[in-house]
């Protein structure tokens, strides 16, 4: 399946289609959008965002705890869309602050 991903960035919102077997960060880069990242392995918070609508599968990541995920935080480098999804990007400071 392919879903609509909307990223709400500091420069404004962007939308693109993302298959359910492609990480959101990877697809965003293919579409020409620059997002923050570091490890690309779900082991840090550089790429953190916050899901405001829809669901993702980020079971490949190990940095976020259950409480953080319950609050909607997501690591875009290890997140597959599971529905149409809206994510606020650039949330590392909010996550770690």
Swiss-Prot record:
<keyword id="KW-0150">Chloroplast</keyword>
<dbReference type="GO" id="GO:0009507">
    <property type="term" value="C:chloroplast"/>
</dbReference>
<feature type="binding site">
    <location>
        <position position="77"/>
    </location>
    <ligand>
        <name>[2Fe-2S] cluster</name>
    </ligand>
</feature>
<dbReference type="GO" id="GO:0006124">
    <property type="term" value="P:ferredoxin metabolic process"/>
</dbReference>
<dbReference type="InterPro" id="IPR006058">
    <property type="entry name" value="2Fe2S_fd_BS"/>
</dbReference>
<dbReference type="InterPro" id="IPR012675">
    <property type="entry name" value="Beta-grasp_dom_sf"/>
</dbReference>
<keyword id="KW-0408">Iron</keyword>
<dbReference type="GO" id="GO:0051537">
    <property type="term" value="F:2 iron, 2 sulfur cluster binding"/>
</dbReference>
<comment type="function">
    <text>Ferredoxins are iron-sulfur proteins that transfer electrons in a wide variety of metabolic reactions.</text>
</comment>
<dbReference type="GO" id="GO:0008198">
    <property type="term" value="F:ferrous iron binding"/>
</dbReference>
<keyword id="KW-0249">Electron transport</keyword>
<protein>
    <recommendedName>
        <fullName>Ferredoxin</fullName>
    </recommendedName>
</protein>
<dbReference type="InterPro" id="IPR001041">
    <property type="entry name" value="2Fe-2S_ferredoxin-type"/>
</dbReference>
<dbReference type="InterPro" id="IPR036010">
    <property type="entry name" value="2Fe-2S_ferredoxin-like_sf"/>
</dbReference>
<dbReference type="InterPro" id="IPR010241">
    <property type="entry name" value="Fd_pln"/>
</dbReference>
<comment type="similarity">
    <text>Belongs to the 2Fe2S plant-type ferredoxin family.</text>
</comment>
<keyword id="KW-0001">2Fe-2S</keyword>
<dbReference type="GO" id="GO:0022900">
    <property type="term" value="P:electron transport chain"/>
</dbReference>
<feature type="binding site">
    <location>
        <position position="47"/>
    </location>
    <ligand>
        <name>[2Fe-2S] cluster</name>
    </ligand>
</feature>
<feature type="binding site">
    <location>
        <position position="44"/>
    </location>
    <ligand>
        <name>[2Fe-2S] cluster</name>
    </ligand>
</feature>
<keyword id="KW-0934">Plastid</keyword>
<keyword id="KW-0411">Iron-sulfur</keyword>
<keyword id="KW-0479">Metal-binding</keyword>
<dbReference type="GO" id="GO:0009055">
    <property type="term" value="F:electron transfer activity"/>
</dbReference>
<dbReference type="Pfam" id="PF00111">
    <property type="entry name" value="Fer2"/>
</dbReference>
<feature type="domain" description="2Fe-2S ferredoxin-type">
    <location>
        <begin position="3"/>
        <end position="93"/>
    </location>
</feature>
<dbReference type="GO" id="GO:0009570">
    <property type="term" value="C:chloroplast stroma"/>
</dbReference>
<feature type="binding site">
    <location>
        <position position="39"/>
    </location>
    <ligand>
        <name>[2Fe-2S] cluster</name>
    </ligand>
</feature>
<keyword id="KW-0813">Transport</keyword>
